[in-house]
Amino acid sequence: MGVQEKDPLLQLSLPPGFRFYPTDEELLVQYLCKKVAGHDFPLQIIGEIDLYKFDPWVLPSKATFGEKEWYFFSPRDRKYPNGSRPNRVAGSGYWKATGTDKVITSQGRKVGIKKALVFYVGKAPKGSKTNWIMHEYRLFESSRKNNGSSKLDEWVLCRIYKKNSSGPKPLMSGLHSSNEYSHGSSTSSSSQFDDMLESLPEMDDRFSNLPRLNSLKAEKFNLDRLDSANFDWAILAGLKPMPELGPANQAPGVQGQAQGHVNNHIHSDNNNMNFLNDVYAHPPNFRGNTKVESINLDEEVESGKRNQRIDQSSYFQQSLNGFSQAYTNNVDQFGIQCPNQTLNLGFKQ
């Protein structure tokens, strides 16, 4: 009988949901440097394998630990006996470098380089590109051992994963499932939605005059007028219907003010309609003595304005005498000479 392999998580009694998601600096300093120095790890999270002997889709079964990403310590062989280029042939294809190398630092000190590679099936340079990606971490030249062997590096650290290119991309690329990253919090989705709401443009004031918003404002006004001390909580729970707040339930002061505003608007509209009817019923004759008729019409309009000003000013003459005197006593220090404008307050006797 074979010996049953133990799960690394069970060996350390780690709780469910544990994920191995180290940073680039941690992979180089805490794992690769220690591996090159001959350090033994108490928990074998990263397996040891020559990954250039296998196709990438076989590597997950060779890994010690991992769900979506798999980590390996692997040696690198030289492409030529005395050269410094690595041999990238692996399995039924080859690994091809892509992008630019990234220098990894720790406490302001350069410790290693991160390189991205893509696996191609077939022979270079006419291979077929796949979705398998490798991130290769290696130490700097000064930190590597050169003993004249065929191996370019004793150990490099590699992260293998398959890029998922099928299916539509998610709406928010910043969201990740808990199976991919261990440090993702449960509040990441809510923060993304808050950012989306904050990015929406603010509504202009013209939208506040929409009928639906006006009805909502009226309902809010009616709810605010309810006395909280006498409010029946059964209404809030939906056990009783909400009482209608019509004109009979409104306060006398509010009802009187509302009726006054309506009467004023109706009276003003009637005056405007009467004026328009008179104009259309008696249009001016422009073919005869146009100049004389225009002068007469202007005199009638000016006479009507003067009468209206006299009627309104007589009602508030006592209140406006002090204001008028204080206004006329002011000296125009800047020489602007603003024209005197008649104050039309819109009150009727």
UniProtKB/Swiss-Prot annotation:
It comes from the Eukaryota. The keyword Transcription applies. Keywords: DNA-binding, Nucleus, Transcription, Transcription regulation. Residues 177-191 have a biased composition (Low complexity). Its main location: nucleus. Residues 169-194 are annotated as: Disordered. It is found in: Nucleus. InterPro entries: NAC-dom, NAC_dom_sf. GO terms for cellular component: nucleus. Residues 14-163 form the NAC domain. Residues 111-169 bind DNA. The keyword Transcription regulation applies. GO terms for biological process: regulation of DNA-templated transcription. SUPFAM superfamilies: NAC domain. Expressed in guard cells of the epidermis. Induction: Induced by abscisic acid (ABA), dehydration and wounding. GO terms for molecular function: DNA binding. The NAC domain includes a DNA binding domain and a dimerization domain. Transcription factor involved in abscisic acid-mediated stomatal closure. Regulates the expression of NCED1, a gene involved in the biosynthesis of abscisic acid (ABA). Required for the stomatal closure induced by the bacterial pathogen Pseudomonas syringae pv tomato DC3000, but not for stomatal reopening. Plants silencing JA2 exhibit a dwarf phenotype. This is NAC domain-containing protein JA2. It comes from Solanum lycopersicum.
